[in-house]
Amino acid sequence: MDLLSVPTILQNAAILTVILALSGYFITSLSTQMLARRRDKLRLVNKRLNEFYGPLYVASEAGDIAYRTLLKRQGKQRSEPIRDEEMKEWVLWMTTIFMPLNDIREKVIIEKAHLIIEERMPQCLLDFVTHVVGYKAVMAKWAEGEYTERRSTIGWPPEFDVYVKRSYAALKAEQTSLLHSGTWRLYHRLFHGKAK
């Protein structure tokens, strides 16, 4: 080996070491940023599910099941005008089942509106809150013994249930995807001892 080539070899080795160190740093930095973004995204998805779309979904499903049960008890296939002989049962179901579920949903929509997926408030959510407010007026009349109005003057927004189900399902799918990606599992194994 030529003595003149030793400095060149050492020089090349030093350059290669610096390149490898910088590459390792950039790869680590990039993966840390990607994992942080994924973690933040998962945190937002979880918050939306736990505080907004989850409660809306559960209350909506429970309300739908209860409403179908009431219709079945009354021998009806679909919503029809409430007859005089059904009024007592209707008031009971409204005050003990439907309005408490409506109140839960109304509170979630009003207090957690910042968690909606869209940039603008979906019209069906506004229509739902308006529907509930209409029922509050009807129920105030009931409390005074006035039963001429039987339903909210603002009808049930049919797209509300579709929106809630679709949004909940999309967020659950996104949550599952974020939780089960290979990078996320590796991150948890390395830094938390197990995959979550």
Language-model segments: what does each one mean?
Residues 1-40:
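Membrane-embedded hydrophobic alpha-helical segments
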